[in-house]
Amino acid sequence: MNNTAASPMSTATSSSGRSTGKSISFATELQSMMYSLGDARRPLHETAVLVEDVVHTQLINLLQQAAEVSQLRGARVITPEDLLFLMRKDKKKLRRLLKYMFIRDYKSKIVKGIDEDDLLEDKLSGSNNANKRQKIAQDFLNSIDQTGELLAMFEDDEIDEVKQERMERAERQTRIMDSAQYAEFCESRQLSFSKKASKFRDWLDCSSMEIKPNVVAMEILAYLAYETVAQLVDLALLVRQDMVTKAGDPFSHAISATFIQYHNSAESTAACGVEAHSDAIQPCHIREAIRRYSHRIGPLSPFTNAYRRNGMAFLAC
């Protein structure tokens, strides 16, 4: 087992030792996702390619670790329990995942058109298929929860500040849109990896794995992939904001070397692949965002993820 995680700029192939999904690309879909998450209306292709590489690398590493957990408990497939186990230390992101699983169950009820008779029949038969994701999560967390804090998340109505900020940003984006732009924006917001399930599975090269993820585990992986994109956009927007020198700011000269190169070096501008005045997120924004995030939860941080290996930390979980 290779214990060295990929660096932010590594390719998925080099990090995993497998040429996974290299003929399949989500770059086009990612451009739409990035737009809906706060990027410019026409996100840069080269930025989307870099984001795709980061997401792919992280998911391959996550799959490898989930497979190891599954193997330790003698299972033949990767299940939601394996992913929940890996996420158990990060309460905020685990809470977000549990809410997602609740919403998936709720949507399933609507799609299947469950009526009162169906619900009564399920109750009488002892079946709980209508809430299968919630039940999986609740049963598993109950089995490992020593303090009650994990189960308390099911009753937690705390506002998710990250989600709130994303919604407010989306609202600000739509203020200046005409009807055609708004329709395009709404369409972009509907995109997800879960709606491209077959392509997503091929992208991760699941068919070549000895221990494969089951259907619900794939749903969670698709969710985590989207959350990784969202967090990359969140962080890159902060980096871009910091790169704008503020008039009258006495500390504007004390920016990092990365920013100095961005402003003053033609080589740095060329490395971004676009003109510096573009309002789109650029590759250098993504790289700086990853550098900051990895440093923030580095080896000396008390909040280091339990499943983080020596290298880039997982963004979504």
UniProtKB/Swiss-Prot annotation:
Region described as Disordered: spans on this chain: 1-20
For this UniProt entry, what is the primary localization, expressed as one broad class?
A: nucleus
Per the record, the covalent cross-link Glycyl lysine isopeptide (Lys-Gly) (interchain with G-Cter in SUMO2) lies at: 112, 123, 163
Per its record, what are the GO molecular function terms? Answer: protein heterodimerization activity; transcription coactivator activity
Q: Which GO terms describe its cellular component?
A: nucleoplasm; nucleus; SAGA complex; transcription factor TFTC complex
- Localized where? Nucleus
Q: Does the keyword Acetylation apply?
A: yes
Q: Which residues form a coiled coil?
A: none
Q: Which Pfam families match?
A: TFIID-18kDa (PF02269)
The entry assigns this protein to a family as follows: Belongs to the SPT3 family.
Q: How does it assemble?
A: Component of the PCAF complex, at least composed of TADA2L/ADA2, SUPT3H, TADA3L/ADA3, TAF5L/PAF65-beta, TAF6L/PAF65-alpha, TAF10/TAFII30, TAF12/TAFII20, TAF9/TAFII31 and TRRAP. Associates with TAFII31 and GCN5L2. Component of the TFTC-HAT complex, at least composed of TAF5L, TAF6L, TADA3L, SUPT3H/SPT3, TAF2/TAFII150, TAF4/TAFII135, TAF5/TAFII100, GCN5L2/GCN5, TAF10 and TRRAP. Component of the STAGA transcription coactivator-HAT complex, at least composed of SUPT3H, GCN5L2, TAF5L, TAF6L, SUPT7L, TADA3L, TAD1L, TAF10, TAF12, TRRAP and TAF9.
Specify the protein name. Answer: Transcription initiation protein SPT3 homolog
The gene it comes from is SUPT3H
